[in-house]
A protein has these predicted regions:
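Peripheral, non-transmembrane regulatory/ligand-interaction domains of membrane transport proteins
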Residues: 1-255
Length: 256
């Protein structure tokens, strides 16, 4: 029988240094409420011009160096802990202060907002991390219009690697589409990661069953407590994500 690790820690990576906005703060005040995970803001700038795909790394987050493709542009913002930098991006692309406030508030429920000429969606990505044997939680926000999609995240993870690979491998479905389709691809990827996390949860339940029957010890009660708390957090995220996706599908029936 395989050895089971003593967990005695939450199965989810949690944000232990939450920043709470001061009550009475004016709407649109930009405060990053999460834990800084990267040293500085950086961009991955993807230009789509038909069959011509260029992926440019902007390591220092230089806004003046951002390029835009003739067909479609994807700007992946890694690091949202710098409110001034995020505000400057908002000014460049016409993103309102209330939307920027939502981007920096990493502890909120998923939502979709139709802004008329542009759109905004934010959601929690829960994915299994093999390196630390936990389910990691990451907020991802997406602002998009007819020509550009901007994704915002704090962690320099490989969350979007499958999409970058599809772009690099010449996936024609992306070449002739607009940012709304790319946004849908991002959300589809997040749903897939939820399913992977579900498989991990199933595995942990089986481990607990074996441990209860064959290897009960003093840590079991605490392990189950942490697991239950993490599982409830996972289940809470699902209906909110489903609602955000449903609102997007209602607004974009032509491509979904």
């Amino acid at each position: 029988m395989k050895n089971l690790k003593k967990t005695s820690k939450p199965l989810f990576e949690t944000n232990n240094k939450k920043v709470i906005k001061t009550p009475g703060t004016a709407p649109g005040t930009l405060v990053f409420t999460g834990k800084q995970k990267v040293s500085h803001v950086s961009f991955i700038n993807t230009l789509v011009d038909g069959d011509d795909i260029k992926i440019i790394k902007n390591e220092h987050g230089d806004i003046d160096r951002i390029q835009e493709g003739k067909g479609m542009t994807w700007l992946d913002v890694i690091g949202i802990h710098d409110p001034e930098k995020i505000e400057a991006l908002g000014e460049k692309y016409g993103i309102g202060k209330l939307i920027l406030e939502d981007i920096l508030n990493v502890n909120q429920n998923p939502k979709y907002i139709d802004l008329g000429n542009s759109n905004f969606v934010t959601f929690q990505s829960l994915f299994y991390n093999k390196n630390d044997n936990k389910i990691n939680k990451e907020q991802i926000s997406v602002f998009f219009n007819s020509s550009i999609m901007i994704t915002f995240r704090e962690d320099d993870s490989e969350t979007f690697q499958p999409i970058y690979e599809r772009l690099s491998n010449g996936n024609n479905r992306f070449h002739n589409r607009k940012p709304d389709y790319l946004t849908y691809a991002v959300m589809d990827l997040i749903v897939d990661k939820f399913l992977e996390a579900t498989q991990y949860i199933d595995m942990k339940i089986e481990e607990f069953e074996v441990k209860i029957e064959n290897h009960p010890d003093n840590t079991l009660k605490q392990d189950i407590f942490y697991f239950r708390r993490s599982f409830l957090e996972f289940m809470k995220a699902i209906p909110a994500l489903r609602e955000a996706i449903a609102k997007m599908k209602f607004s974009f029936n032509d491509f979904l």
